[in-house]
């Protein structure tokens, strides 16, 4: 393995501010096939794979709090509505309510 290659299992904080974990070492793969956001990896280990249009958010807004109870899956569209309408807070219960409102918005405004 070249000296500048990270081994599988390496964790890095990338420019987006999130922790990414190297999950594979395929030399011809796209970058996203070798790396996965840690919160998504944890969610998928507990609940199974998520579709590509779903991301995992931190209910308390702290992107270093990987407690499974602090993680929630949302679709890209739900995430957009949450950000547009300020439905993300540092209070996990309010963020859960925001997710539900965003889901209603997505389902009724399509």
Can you describe what each PLM-predicted range is?
Residues 1-29, 78-105, 109:
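Secondary-structure boundary/linker elements at domain or insertion junctions
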Residues 32-105:
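Short, cationic Gly/His-enriched loop motifs
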């Amino acid at each position: 393995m070249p000296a500048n290659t990270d081994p599988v299992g390496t964790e890095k904080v990338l420019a987006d501010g999130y922790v990414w974990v190297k999950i594979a070492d395929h030399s011809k793969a796209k970058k996203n096939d070798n790396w996965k956001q840690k919160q998504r990896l944890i969610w998928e280990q507990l609940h199974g794979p998520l579709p590509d249009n779903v991301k995992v958010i931190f209910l308390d807004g702290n992107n270093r709090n990987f407690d499974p109870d602090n993680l929630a899956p949302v679709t890209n569209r739900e995430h957009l509505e949450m950000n547009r309408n300020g439905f993300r807070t540092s209070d996990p219960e309010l963020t859960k309510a925001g997710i539900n409102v965003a889901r209603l918005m997505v389902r009724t405004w399509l």
